[in-house]
UniProtKB/Swiss-Prot annotation:
NCBIfam families: DTMP_kinase (TIGR00041)
Signal peptide positions (record): none
InterPro entries: P-loop_NTPase, Thymidylate_kin-like_dom, Thymidylate_kinase
Gene name tied to this protein: tmk
Protein name: Thymidylate kinase
Database matches in CDD domains: TMPK
Molecular function, one GO term: ATP binding
Annotated EC: 2.7.4.9
Taxonomic lineage: Bacteria, Pseudomonadati, Campylobacterota, Epsilonproteobacteria, Campylobacterales
One matching Pfam family: Thymidylate_kin
Positions with a binding annotation for ATP: 7-14
UniProt keyword Kinase, yes or no: yes
Domain of life: Bacteria
Amino acid sequence: MLVNFEGVDGVGKSTQISLLKEFRNDAVITKEPGGTEFGLMVRDYLLKNASKISNKTEIFLFLADRAEHYEKVLKPNYANLVLNDRSFVSGMAYAMANDSSLDIGLLLDLNKFALNSDLGDKFVFLKADEILLRNRLFSRGTSDEIEMRGIEYLMRVQGFMSIILSDLKFDVLEIDASLEVLEIQEKIRKFI
């Protein structure tokens, strides 16, 4: 079973995946981008240079990583529980936040091609308000090129994530990221 964890930076995806791994030590943990050697290169490049390339180039780099990730990580582990930190939903949402004129149908078709139409079984969507995001990102003390686009940008991305997950009628657990960490974990365990 493929469970995709979605949400913008700072909502607690990695924390929840780590806690779930303690509960299900047979789970395979991965992330996009960065779940493969190629993905690490893409991730590193984009975190440092996102403002230097066109939106289309950024989309295709993420799609290339997604295709490689599918072939090297997701497909070989199909029989296992796979916990994926981000998925095509993030890719589409960030792309649409950068250019709201993009066709959601085209983006979905490109992602289906990259993923051999295997979009995932369940989605955990952690949502936060502006205050929570600002506090969490400030407490980290670090920011990459994408985070430097600002809280308003991240809220726009989150809005597109919500639209995509709702429109595509996936099996989604939407959770308020301001809840206690263990309360969130309990909801996720029941969902999976």
